[in-house]
From Swiss-Prot:
The chain crosses the membrane at residues 34-50, 64-86. One of its GO terms (biological process) is mitochondrial respirasome assembly. InterPro entries: Hypoxia_induced_domain (IPR007667), RCF1 (IPR050355). Its main location: mitochondrion. Pfam families: HIG_1_N. It is a multi-pass membrane protein. This is Respiratory supercomplex factor 1, mitochondrial. Residues 113-143 form a coiled coil. It comes from the Eukaryota. It is found in: Mitochondrion membrane. Residues 6-97 form the HIG1 domain.
Length: 152
């Protein structure tokens, strides 16, 4: 029994760790949708520039290389901006999680106090019952109904 690891409320299991690689990629793409779009557009610009170089069309190749630089810059701006926005959302989410944890702790404390009060009431009832039983026993002894000594 001692070797069994029981879950703890202090263990903060990150659901991101349990995801597969494709799920992680999809999760990140949903977080910052402009970054994959920018990467795809940059790849298209590089492919078209490579096509221009292969065919010898220097003007077209140069145009697509310029587009590539611009699209990479926009992708970088989208990445930094998305990270900033996501960080702000995480801060507010963290505050919300802390509030929920505080409420949960307060609820547990209230339940614990109720349990202690219930146990206290039960102890008082048991003491009162024992006191009444002792009083009844004393009353029976004084009237002679109950004899503690065995017959000789």
């Amino acid at each position: 029994m001692a070797s069994v690891n029981y879950p703890s409320s202090f263990d903060k299991k990150d659901e991101f760790e349990d995801m597969s690689i494709l799920d992680k990629i999809w999760f990140r793409c949903k977080q910052q949708p402009l970054v994959p779009i920018g990467c795809l557009a940059t790849c298209v610009a590089v492919a078209l520039a490579a096509k221009g170089v292969r065919t010898g069309d220097r003007v077209n190749a140069q145009k697509w290389f310029r587009w590539r630089v611009g699209l990479q810059g926009l992708t970088l701006v989208a990445l930094v901006g998305g990270s900033y926005i996501y960080d702000r959302q995480q801060v507010t989410q963290r505050k919300t999680d802390e509030d929920l944890a505080r409420e949960k702790a307060q609820h547990r404390q209230d339940l614990w106090i109720q349990e202690l009060e219930r146990r206290d009431q039960e102890t008082k009832r048991n003491k009162e019952r024992a006191r009444l039983a002792r009083a009844r026993l004393e009353a029976e002894r004084s009237t002679g109904i109950l004899d503690d000594e065995p017959p000789k």
